[in-house]
C-alpha cells in the first residue's frame, strides 16, 4: 500500500507512503524526469508505482531505479516499453554536488517520495533521508497512536 493512485485530473500521480515509515526525511527536493512518450501517457492514466524505487547518484547524475510505469495497451506498437527502466532525474548542478557530498560523506540516502504534475510536466519529489532503526519506528507508531487517541477524546469530550 505504498503507492496511491490519484483521481483523474489531480496533480498527484503516485506516493511512496512507506518512505516516511522507513526513513527520517531531512530535506525535500523537486526533480524533473526524462521520460519517453509512452511513459507520459501511463502517468496521465495514473499507472505508476514508487513502492520499491530508489534514487542513485552515478557519474555526477541522479537516476531513478525500480519505479514501475505500466505501459498502456494502446501504446505504440513499434516501441518496446520497459516498465522498470532507469530514468534520469533533472537537477541543478549545485543541488547535485550538494547531494553527492551529503550522500557520500554523511551517510544519507535519496528516496523518491511522490510523483506529480506541475505546469504540465512530471516532477518527482525526492527526500534526503536517514534510515530509521526498529526502536525509532516503534516510537513513531506509538506517537501516531497517541495523537489519534487524543483526537478521539477531544471529539467526544
UniProtKB/Swiss-Prot annotation:
**What are the BP-aspect GO terms?**
trans-translation
List the GO molecular function terms.
RNA binding
Where found, per UniProt? Cytoplasm
Q: Where is this region: Disordered?
A: 128-157
Q: Where does this chain mainly localize?
A: cytoplasm
Question: Which cysteines are cross-linked by disulfides?
Answer: none
- Asked if the keyword Cytoplasm belongs to this entry, the reply reads yes
Q: Which family does it belong to?
A: Belongs to the SmpB family.
- Spell out the PANTHER family in the cross-references: SSRA-BINDING PROTEIN, TMRNA-BINDING COMPONENT OF TRANS-TRANSLATION TAGGING COMPLEX
The protein's name: SsrA-binding protein
Annotated source species? Methylococcus capsulatus (strain ATCC 33009 / NCIMB 11132 / Bath)
